[in-house]
Each structure stands twice: as C-alpha cells, then as structure tokens.
Design a protein with these regions (language model features):
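Short glycine-rich His-centered loop
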Residues: 1-17
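A structural motif corresponding to the C-terminal lobe/cap of the Radical SAM core domain
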Residues: 8-11, 158, 303, 336, ...
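Short catalytic helix/loop segments, enriched in acidic residues and glycine
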Residues: 15-30
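A general structural detector for well-ordered alpha-helical segments in enzyme core domains, enriched
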Residues: 26, 87, 111-122, 149-154, ...
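Glycine-rich beta-alpha loop elements in corrinoid/cobalamin-binding modules
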Residues: 26-29, 36-46, 50, 71-211
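Hydrophobic/aromatic residues located in beta-strands of well-ordered beta-sheets
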Residues: 37, 130, 189-190, 325, ...
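Radical SAM [4Fe-4S] cluster-binding motif and immediate context
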Residues: 221-417, 439
Length: 554
C-alpha cells in the first residue's frame, strides 16, 4: 500500500491509522486460493520514519512531473531511489514471485505518484512482474481525459494496471503467467487497462465478490483504537460507542481522532481494539443521478447470504478479538428479507457485536429498526441529500420526506445514532431549495447526530455526467489538467494552499443553461456550506476543544 500525505495533513491520524479493507479482501481471496500472501502498508513506515517537516520535504519530488516521467521511462533518479529504498529497508521483499502495489483510494496524489514510482523501482530491482490497483485507478480512469498524460506515461511501462475489483484479475494474471500465456490473452483479462491506438481503454471490470477480509501477517496494532477497558462494564462499552461511533473521526481536528489521542496519552484504563471493516453487498438498486452507482454496470445488487455473512463476522470477531465492526455497504437494508434474517440469527445465537452501516430510509419500519438495534446496530448513515422535492425528483432520489422524518424519530427512540449526507450545489438548486434542506434539518435536529456536508461534483459515469442537458447544465471539462493538479497538490502539501484533498475529485465544472455560470455556483456553494456548518451539533466542537486542551497539558 502506497503512503498517503493525509498523515502529514491530519496529524491525529498518527494515533490510529485506518485499516484498509481492500488489502484485507485481496488477502482473504488469494490466501483461500492457496497463495502465500505478504502485505505491507507503507503508511506505517511514514508514521515511524517521517514525522517532521524536514523529512516531509523529501516527498516534494514525487509531485515533479518531469522527474516522475523520467523515472517511469528510465528508472534513473538517485533521489527517488533513495526515498523508496528508505521506505523498503525494514522489509524483506527480495524473494517474492510477483508484486502488487495499491495506489489507494482517497484522491491522494502523493499516494498515486509514489505508488507508480514504487512499482517501477520494484520492477527494475527484482525483475519481476508488478500489478497496480486501488480505487484511485478507477478515479483516474473515470477522468481519463484529464489524466491522459499520466496514462500515456504509466501504460507505456506497466502491463497490469487493474480497474475495479482486483482479486480475481490477479489470480488470472498469475495463472496465465505460470502457463506462459501470450501477451494478447493477458491484455484481455477483465479489469486490465490498455493503451490502444492512442486511446486509454479498460476491459470490463470484474464483478465484486463477498469476501471475508484477512490481513495475513500485517502488524495491525497501528490500526487499533484506544478504548476504555471494558471488563463487561456497561459504562465502559457505552463510553466507547460514543467515542468511536457517535463522534466523527475522519477529518482534521475531528473529536473522534482527538479522543483516541487523549486516551492513548492520558488514560491508564485503556486497551487497544480493532474496529473491523467488512462489506457484504455491492452496487445499488436505486439510480440517483449524481452517483457513480447510477452507471449502467452497477444496477445489479450483489448481496451476501445471511448465514455466510454471520459466519464471516464470527470468524473475524474471534480472529481479531473484537466486538466492533464498521459495515461499509451502500445500504444495509438493500433487502428487507436479508435484514430480518441477518438480525434474527444474530439475536438467536446471542452474538454480541456493535456495528454501524449506511442505509436507505425506504423499507424501514419501527419493528425492523428495533430488530437491528437488538442485533447490535449502533449508528446508521442515510443519504438524505436535499429537502427540496424538486431536487429529489430531479436526481431520482426516491425518498419520502415524511417517512424519512419518521425513521429519524424511530432511530432516536431506539437509541440508534443517525448521520445524514447532505449535498449542496446540485444542478438547479436555488435559494428556495437550499432553504428547504435547512428547514428539514432544523425541524429534525434533535434526531440527527451529525450531517456530512458534500459539495456536488460531476462524476462522468453518473447519469448527470452522461446526460448533462437533461439536468439543465453544460459541462466544463477543461478547468483542470494533470499538471495543474500536481502543482496545486504540491502547494497543498507544502501548506501554501488551504484546499482539501477531496477537491481533487472536483475536476469538471458546469454552467446551468440560461441560469447561473460556474463561478456563481461555486460562490453560492461556499455560502451554503458555511451556513450548514454553523448548524452542526455544537457537542462535537466543544468536545474537540476540551480534549485538545487536556492533551496539551504537561
């Protein structure tokens, strides 16, 4: 796993890295196939070796397009060799048969660039095949016109760049290499990206599988949360659920990150516990126009069998000695039948676990939510997006706002925390539409734990990206290019810019036909984000300030 600059940007993350589910899925699948798999997360090396500003400067070369291009083409650069060798010095990887590099999933250009450089180094140093994957590959491919120069560079050197789920693709590559299969057959494997007659073309991606993750021989101590020691104490369990489920912990200064630091530095009644990520359904039966899940190849749900999923959960609970899970499905309640069966079985066997997941308001009743609570549900995150009926209809959200309110109240009564996702800046969102969103939030503020504020950006393979005129907009595709993004990210890395990393995903702009232009939309969005931010529950900022102060006391 290539390292991300988020550890430099969000220093509290040093106190608990995020365990990568993709590595676990790969490990689980390939080990079941009989492969001896060794996995290494170079973010751990980043934590151990490169904490200060002087060492941070070593990474600035990664953003240099000329050095990047020269190294991929020639493999000759003493500075880059030195940086990579320093990263790999504590690992014995010289005698493996084949190598893989993940370039991550969070739009990090350090992670992307470093990952490709690392793959080139390994290829030259060990003279072995290297495959490259990670969700950032899908991001780069979706915006392949923006990143055409990068694709031309890396596809000139690497045969096995994988788009989409990689586990079966890797298995096929290895089998075909062992059988001395010709290059034409190798290049036709599903998921492989090729450069053909000046075009960047991905073969159809593999369908995802429900796989029990297994992180093999990785040192998982870096991913643990510093929890209050429980000893069957209901009070301690309640505290831990507040700290690590109720309180947000994914952004700079978030109270969840700070409390983890405080527990580690200041408390003695603590123990380290993993919260295991696990996914058991893919794709989405709905067709929200803004979402990448509205792509034509993602409408068919791939869902796990309740008995098999529970079997996986039990195995993960026992192997990693934890009752805590983050389920990472698009919608836990994609199927009422699955929900009822899964929850009843957990209750019947008295399986003690705590979990959170995403959900849809649709098909949820008080009784079903009560069942979920008894089965260990702690928090649900719902895609609310907008309180405007006009916007809901435009994006084909298919939610009933009255029912959504009832679900929020039921969750509150049952003790399930609810986060909601809000999107600002959707096409044709005017003052009256935004005000409807604010009114819904204010009306239901008592029942909403936290709301995630997302600024809309166009995804090319979504319905809005494919048919912009239907949504009253025209796309602007030239506001960014690869070189400009590298320059902007270097400035951010050096703290010369206050852009957040997720701005890397906002690569297309748009004008509304006969209404607002792009600049006006961006200006409106800033005001909306500011207003919504001021509506958040004050509990989180107050707790963050309090525990930050306690951490700083000598």
């Amino acid at each position: 796993m290539s390292p991300s600059e988020s550890l430099f940007q969000y220093t509290e993350k040093i106190y608990a890295l995020s365990i990568n589910l993709g590595l676990g899925v790969l490990g689980g699948y390939l080990q079941d196939k009989g492969y001896n798999v060794k996995m290494r997360d170079l973010n751990i090396t980043l934590v151990n070796k490169y904490k200060d500003e002087n060492s941070k400067k070593l990474f600035e070369i990664v953003f240099d397009i000329n050095k990047f291009k020269n190294y991929i083409f020639t493999g000759n650069d003493i500075e880059i060799d030195s940086l990579i060798e320093s990263f790999l010095s504590e690992y014995d990887i010289a005698n493996e048969d084949i190598y893989g590099v993940s370039i991550g999933s969070d739009f990090s250009f350090l992670q992307i660039q470093f990952g490709f450089l690392l793959a080139k180094y390994i290829k030259i140093k060990f003279n072995k095949h290297v495959f490259i994957g990670g969700n950032n590959i899908s991001f780069l491919y979706i915006f392949k016109d923006v990143f055409k120069e990068m694709w031309e560079i890396v596809l000139s050197e690497f045969k096995f760049i994988i788009n989409g789920p990689g586990e079966r693709c890797i298995d096929e590559i290895i089998q075909d290499l062992n059988n001395n299969t010709n290059s034409d057959k190798l290049s036709s494997i599903n998921g492989i990206i090729n450069y053909i007659d000046g075009e960047i073309i991905s073969n159809p991606t593999m369908k995802p599988l429900i796989i029990k993750p297994d992180w093999g021989d990785m040192d998982l101590s870096y991913y643990t949360k510093c929890m209050i020691s429980e000893n069957d104490s209901e009070k301690a369990i309640k505290e831990n659920l507040i700290y690590f489920y109720k309180w947000p912990d994914t952004f700079a200064g978030s109270v969840g990150q700070i409390i983890n630091k405080y527990n580690k530095l200041r408390r003695s009644d603590v123990s380290n516990k993993l919260i295991i990520p696990y996914i058991f359904n893919y794709n989405c039966p709905y067709n929200c126009a803004f979402c990448t899940q509205s792509d034509i190849d993602r409408s068919s749900i791939i869902g796990g069998d309740p008995d098999e999923v529970i079997k996986d959960v039990i195995a993960l609970k026992e192997k990693y000695n934890t009752n805590y899970f983050y389920f990472l499905n698009n919608a836990f309640n994609f199927s009422p039948k699955f929900v009822d069966s899964f929850c009843k079985k957990i209750i019947d066997i008295n399986l003690e676990i705590h979990w959170s997941d995403c959900g849809r308001f649709n098909n949820l009743t008080y009784e079903r939510l009560e069942l979920m609570k008894k089965a260990g549900c702690v928090k649900l995150t719902f895609g609310f997006e907008s309180g405007s009926l006009k916007i809901i209809e435009l994006i084909d959200k298919r939610i009933n706002l009255d029912h959504a309110e009832r679900v929020l109240k039921w969750c509150y009564e049952l003790g399930i925390w609810v986060d909601i996702e809000v999107i600002v800046g959707l096409p044709q969102e005017y003052d009256e539409d935004f005000n409807a969103t604010c009114e819904f939030i204010n009306k239901n503020k008592k029942y909403i734990n936290y709301f995630w504020i997302n600024e809309f950006f166009v995804v090319p393979n979504s319905l809005i990206g494919r048919y912009p005129e239907k949504y009253g907009i025209e796309l602007i595709k030239d506001i960014n290019n690869y070189r400009k993004l590298l320059d902007n990210n270097l400035k951010m890395f050096k703290r010369e810019s206050d852009n957040v990393m997720t701005s890397n995903s906002k690569l297309f702009g748009f004008n509304e036909i006969n209404r607002r232009n792009f600049d006006a939309i961006v200006s409106d969005n800033r005001k909306k984000i500011s207003k919504l931010s001021n509506m958040q529950n004050s509990e989180f900022n107050e707790a963050a300030k309090f525990y930050t102060m306690l951490c700083e006391i000598k």
